[in-house]
Every structure is written in structure tokens, then in C-alpha cells.
Design a protein with these regions (language model features):
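Outer-membrane beta-barrel biogenesis signature
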Residues: 35-38, 50
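Extracellular glycoside hydrolase catalytic/binding regions
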Residues: 38, 199-348, 352-370
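Active-site beta-strand termini and strand-to-loop segments that position acidic
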Residues: 48-49, 278
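Sec/Tat signal peptide C-region and signal peptidase I cleavage site
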Residues: 30-33
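Bacterial N-terminal signal peptides that target proteins for export
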Residues: 2-18
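Active-site mouth of glycoside hydrolases
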Residues: 41-47, 53-56, 60-260, 265-273
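Bacterial N-terminal signal peptides
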Residues: 16-27
């Protein structure tokens, strides 16, 4: 039996969970009626509290808390900070701040969560930007004001009530763990070079784990998204990855013995050669693959890793190709008992997502301005009207459901 299995009596009491949350000033307490039904690693499987195999069928909530340029049709403003700066120029800083509050409120709602569950998914993976969870004064721009905590709390509650599991994914770590736009860093993986960034990353995970240690809706903690791009100094950086993972896990385990820790390989999550013998009894390993042939050859190294170390493996991001490929690839994963999380749930004017935001009239003007410094900005009043139309279009009641996409994953439109 796994060391964190409930039969070993290691679940915190309901009163103890509440007391710890309040003592730490976390502002969040787990449900007092929650059952000890954590997902945990058991050999090559993930299992629930009853010992039944849990195969992840997940979707990524991309663009919600970590905006990406291509999901707005921007070619130049690509990172979250670049996108934020563009909106400051487009409609002014004050209106831009109001835009982001509304954006986060409408992009993922309880209706979206219920739809995801009804379609047949059992998991959502939520990318986080550390800036949204930083202490006051710790984040250089001071613009985010720890806005992420109530949003994540709310999502977890919705998922618990809907019967979905949540993978918490640190998509943009302090300093940037990847060296590309979606880690919101300077273009190089400074998480590994700057001691302050490293310590902030460890401290954030400890705080997340302390807050959610008794929350059964959370499946696990995806410690770093796609660390160390192949463009970086991989000979130096790759050996640093598992060392950082060990330190993060030690911090997590000091407050949370319940949740699975999810470890991604280097170079877009593909390279498992950076790993040695597993160092935590409740760990799973996750890889990312896009646009590969849907054959066993593409999975073999991960199957070998799983067999060698007797650990669970699943794919944390994939998709954005076509529906025929989706069908073949998800079936291939399931054939070998591997879970999956496709990317993304919602996108703008796309057939390659679960739902699509209908492009508002005039959005091409915004997209052009976000794609070239030479493109003129629309007049502010016009830009504000277009942005408001986008927010309305992003609401669940107004999106287009991509039934063929959902069907290609072996699921169905409710």
C-alpha cells in the first residue's frame, strides 16, 4: 500500500485541516465534509481512495491565467507580460486592468466546468503564472495583487462540486523555467540561474501545498511546465532540473503528504533522460508531445521509463493538429493505460479546441496591432468597444461547441 494511502491514517483530520489553513493565514479551508479520496501512485497506475485505476481524460484551461499571444491572434505580443503591455497601450492602463478582471471572470466559469464534466472529461489542468500568486511587493510590476488565489479557490470548488479533478500546473515560474514566451520570463530559463527565483519557486509550491493539502478535488501538482527549452544551455541546465524538483518536493511534503507530484521532463517535457531513480513514493511523470505520428514508437521511451521504475506516466499536453489525429492518439494512449490532457479547452476562432470564441467584428484590427509594431492602434473608443465585444463572446453562452473535436476524443456533447 502506498505510504499516503488513507488506510495508513495519514489524512489530516477535518478540524486539523481547518486549523492549519487558518493558522497559516491562507484564506482557504478544504470542505469539512470531504472524504479521504485522494488520487495517488500505485505502481504504474494512478488510483483513487478505493484502489480503482484512475485514467486521466483531461483538458487544459490554457490562456485563462497564463495568456498566450497566439490565442489572441497576436504574433508579436506573445508572453503574458507583453500581452498586458499591449492592452495598456491599446485601451489605457486603468481600462486594461478592468479588462483583465473581467477576462478572468468570464473566460472560465462554473458553466464551463459543468460542460467539461458533462462532455466526459474527468480532469482539468490549470496553468498558473506565479505573478498572480506573488506576495505584495514581491512581483515587480505590482499590478496583479495576488489575484490568482480567489480564482484558483473558486475553480477548485466548482470542480469538486462537478466531480472533476484538478492538476495545478506552474506554467510560468519566477524567472521563467523554459526560456520562451509562455513562461513569462526574459527569454532564458532564469529560474535555474538566479537563487531568488529558485527560492520563490520552492516557496510558492509550499504555499500552494499548504493551502490545498486536504483538498481531494486536486489530483496533483505539476511542478514546472516544459522546463529548459532546447535552445538553452542544456548541458548545464538539465542536471539542475531534478535537483530543483527534489527541493520543491521536500517543501511540499513538509505540509502535504497527500497529493501526487507530477514531474515533467526537460526540452518541452520530452526528455526523461534527466531523471534518475524516483525519489518520492507518490510521484508520476508527465510528458508533452505535439504533431507526432500516432504510433507506439513515439511512446516507447516513456513506456520503458514507466516499466523500469514502476511509476505512472501520462501526457500533460497534446493536440492542436486535427480530429483524425486526436482520435488515433488518444486511443494509443489508452491502449497502453496512459492518461491524457489535450490542449486547449477554449480558443479564439478555432476548430482545434473544445469550444471556440467567435471572433468579434473588428478583432482583426486588434490582432494586427498585436502582431506588428508598425501597425496602427485603433482609436481608443473603437478598441474598447471591440475588446468589450470579445469579453461578451468569451462567455460560455456565446461560444461555439466543436462537436467533432469532442467526439474525436471519444467523448460526446452533452
Amino acid at each position: 500500500m502506498n505510504a499516503v494511502d488513507g488506510t495508513h491514517g495519514r489524512w489530516p483530520s477535518q478540524l486539523g485541516a481547518l486549523t492549519l489553513a487558518l493558522a497559516l493565514g491562507l484564506g482557504y479551508a478544504p470542505p469539512l465534509a470531504a472524504s479521504p479520496d485522494f488520487i495517488h501512485a500505485d505502481g504504474k497506475r494512478l488510483v483513487d481512495g478505493r484502489g480503482e485505476t484512475f485514467v486521466i481524460k483531461g483538458i487544459n484551461l490554457g490562456n485563462w491565467l497564463v495568456p498566450e499571444g497566439y490565442m489572441f491572434k497576436f504574433k508579436q505580443a506573445r508572453s503574458p507580460s507583453e500581452i498586458a503591455g499591449f492592452f495598456d497601450s491599446l485601451i489605457g492602463p486603468e481600462d486594461a486592468s478592468r479588462f483583465w478582471v473581467k477576462f478572468r471572470d468570464v473566460y472560465i466559469t462554473e458553466e464551463d466546468v459543468r460542460f467539461i464534466k458533462a462532455a466526459g472529461f474527468n480532469t482539468v489542468r490549470v496553468p498558473l503564472n506565479w505573478r498572480l500568486f506573488a506576495e505584495p511587493g514581491d512581483e515587480p510590476s505590482h499590478r496583479y495583487q495576488a489575484a490568482g488565489w480567489p480564482l484558483l479557490d473558486r475553480l477548485v470548488q466548482w470542480c469538486r462540486e462537478a466531480g472533476l479533478r484538478v492538476i495545478v500546473d506552474l506554467h510560468a515560474a519566477p524567472g521563467g523555467q523554459t526560456g520562451v514566451n509562455h513562461d513569462d520570463g526574459p527569454g532564458y530559463p532564469l529560474t535555474f540561474y538566479v537563487p531568488q527565483n529558485r527560492q520563490r519557486t520552492i516557496a510558492l509550491w509550499q504555499k500552494l501545498a499548504a493551502r490545498y493539502h486536504a483538498e481531494t478535488a486536486i489530483l496533483g501538482y505539476d511542478l514546472l511546465n516544459e522546463p529548459i527549452s532546447p535552445y538553452s544551455d542544456v548541458e548545464y541546465l538539465n542536471p539542475q532540473l531534478e535537483r530543483l524538483y527534489r527541493d520543491i518536493v521536500a517543501a511540499i511534503r513538509s505540509v502535504d503528504q497527500n497529493h501526487v507530484v507530477l514531474l515533467e521532463g526537460a526540452q518541452w517535457g520530452t526528455n526523461f533522460a534527466v531523471f534518475h531513480q524516483p525519489f518520492d513514493a507518490n510521484a508520476a511523470y508527465t510528458y508533452h508531445k505535439f504533431w507526432i505520428n500516432p504510433t507506439r514508437d513515439g511512446l516507447q521511451s516513456y513506456l520503458d521509463f514507466s516499466n523500469r521504475w514502476n511509476v505512472p506516466v501520462f501526457i500533460g499536453e497534446t493536440g492542436e493538429f486535427n480530429n483524425s489525429w486526436n482520435d488515433k492518439f488518444h486511443r494509443l494512449q489508452e491502449r497502453f493505460g496512459l492518461g491524457w490532457c489535450f490542449w486547449p479547452y477554449k480558443n479564439l476562432d478555432s476548430d482545434l479546441s473544445v469550444v471556440s470564441i467567435q471572433k468579434p467584428v473588428g478583432w482583426d484590427l486588434i490582432a494586427e496591432a498585436g502582431s506588428s509594431a508598425k501597425a496602427p492602434l485603433p482609436a481608443r473608443a473603437q478598441a474598447q468597444a471591440i475588446v468589450n465585444a470579445y469579453l461578451e463572446a468569451a462567455k460560455f453562452k456565446n461560444v461555439r461547441v466543436n462537436a467533432d473535436y469532442i467526439n474525436s476524443l471519444g467523448l460526446s456533447v452533452p
